Amino acid sequence: MGSRGDHGGGGGGRGAARATQLKVLVPSSFRKMRICDELAAQLGVGVGGGGAPRAATARVASPLGKAWDVGVVRDGDGRAFLGRGWAEFAAAHGLGVGWFVVLRHGGGVLAVEAFDTTCCLRVFGAPPAEAGRATDTSRKPQFLTVLLPGIMDKMRIPDKFVRDYITGENLNSNMAIILSPLGKSWRVELDKDQSGVFLGGGWLQFLSFHGISRGDVVIFRYEGNLVFKISVFGPNGRQKDFKAKGISIYQGTGEQQEAPSFSRRKCNNKKKSRFGEDDGNQQEMPCSRKGSGNKGRTSDRETKRMRKTRSVYEIGPRSWIKKEINEYVLERCILSLARTFCESIGLVEESSITLMMIDTTSTQGDQGGSSSSSRSWEVTGRRYKDACYLLGAGWRRFCEDNGVRSGDVCVFTVLDTTLWRVDIERC
């Protein structure tokens, strides 16, 4: 959407860097959307004397042939939002929960790029120019990936992107080239199997060399002939400027960061990752028993059943927690989560949490492939003294709709405090 420049991040007016921000859309984003202070300042919004909010109007370019006026305002706490007109803009372009948007300000216009649940750039109006021939960078195909646990050493290219933009001749190649933000080119092996197409050998080394880590979001712009140019956004949504910030570059020396394996029974980073610290697991779950004479204690049988729900989790820029589901969880319709984990992501009071599942379905045709869609459930998250819980009718419905069984493992990745992506590892 809108006109866009190079992902490398050029200068704006008067030599100032152009403000860029990546946002993930949560249910509340469709009424108003929080933006960073730098972007708000470039849109002309500051805090007046006495802390009184100031408002401005941003000109948002749309490929649908209309220029949208969207209000920018700070609330009483000084936080900046896109407000009046934003809900109409989002509805007109079909933006959805779990999508990513990139906001770029330049030339007096706010441009918006939207990546849907396929992780591909959503095309509005005319399709992107044929890969390799486009001279306007805004017309080149793009996709993004969130670096989550388990995909650091091998990254899957979205099936839709492969089907739409990568030719059969290119797929016969065993090598892709990545143009890094430092101006270097990297050769990465192209792996293919029945499940999809991946960036394989050399990918982890590329990440390690550039200091790109878990929780970062990488956007790939396709130059054609298996050549990709990338830009990187940190978990705070700000684009990383490798040159200006002097990010330390290091070679893998045997101590490079390793993606956690969900088959392991502990995590390597003791400061950020913990196993079996479900603080509530040795406590009686709320509303789970009646009239116990040993308050605060569980029977040996109950303790044994509850131990199976212990978790592996990581607290970090892109926090995640892995939980094994057992009969106790399904019968009681309540799932305990480690107190430390909940506190770290800002879940400190009862909240409505959106659980999102990405569904991939096979498509028919000469080239085959798959398409993706998202489904979501509203679940109550409740904080108690020693733990927090997902519970109630929403959690029951989630389990029923997804056929969750005893022995399955749910991996919750926190995209936002109240928006979690869920992947289910079947037993």
Curated annotation (Swiss-Prot):
Where is this gene product found? Nucleus
Q: Which residues bind DNA?
A: 25-118, 140-236, 320-427
Q: Which Pfam families match?
A: B3
Highest taxon, organism lineage: Eukaryota
Primary location: nucleus
Q: Where is this region: Disordered?
A: 253-309
GO annotations of cellular component type:
nucleus
Q: Which UniProt keywords apply?
A: DNA-binding, Nucleus, Repeat, Transcription, Transcription regulation
Fetch the SMART domains from UniProt: B3
The chain's coiled-coil residues are none
Known InterPro entries for this protein? B3_DNA-bd, DNA-bd_pseudobarrel_sf, REM_fam
Is the DNA-binding keyword given for this protein? yes
Molecular function terms from GO: DNA binding
Bias (Basic residues) ranges: 263-273
Which PANTHER family does the UniProt entry name for this protein?
A: B3 DOMAIN-CONTAINING PROTEIN REM-LIKE 3-RELATED, B3 DOMAIN-CONTAINING PROTEIN REM14-RELATED
Q: What is this protein called?
A: Putative B3 domain-containing protein Os04g0346900
Query: What is the source species?
Result: Oryza sativa subsp. japonica (Rice)
